[in-house]
Amino acid sequence: PYRSVSKGDTVSFGSYEQDGNTSNGPEPITWIVLDKIDGQLLLLSADVLEARQYHHVPFEEVTWENSDLRAWMNGNFYEGAFTPVQRGLIETVHNENADQSITGASGGAATDDRVFALSETESVIYLNTPAARSDIGAAPASVHAAAGPLSVSEDGTADWWLRSPGTYGFATQFVDATGVPSLSGANVDLQYGVRPALWINVEGIGEGSR
């Protein structure tokens, strides 16, 4: 079913608690197809699935490589949201983590990730028009995510983390509830929304490079 999809389509892949009712089990995750390159799809969760800190230590300079958010995405989320067969479709990608474009705050070392938050560069590419910011950038928070310490707008949307540094090393960029990226960022210990991103190989099972 994934081979025929186009950029901008939505697909269902994996499952995660979203409706706030754990007794009925996790709900299928809906993803937006941000890109399609050589039989591989870049997926971004359509909704804010969780509220989490980027890192738990206030005012500690931290990059994506050593962040709590990266550990959670590639640990508990990856292992819990996808079946073994689905995990076989998820590519391990080599992410370059560029410095902040204005202040030069360090983006840290390159990382090999199965699941990741989008970068400043990716936000520029995929949220480059008002339509993209409203259609893709502004993300509704799931009932589960909104039940925590997440600030949710009147429209039901929430701020969500990128992985790139903000003005300082203890701040991280995010996309606000209206879909507009914030270069200056927010302190890493704040509870912001999480929208996992990943590449899947729709040509077959197994790892590779994009």
How would you label these PLM feature ranges?
Residues P1-R210:
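Collagenous Gly-X-Y triple-helix signature in extracellular proteins
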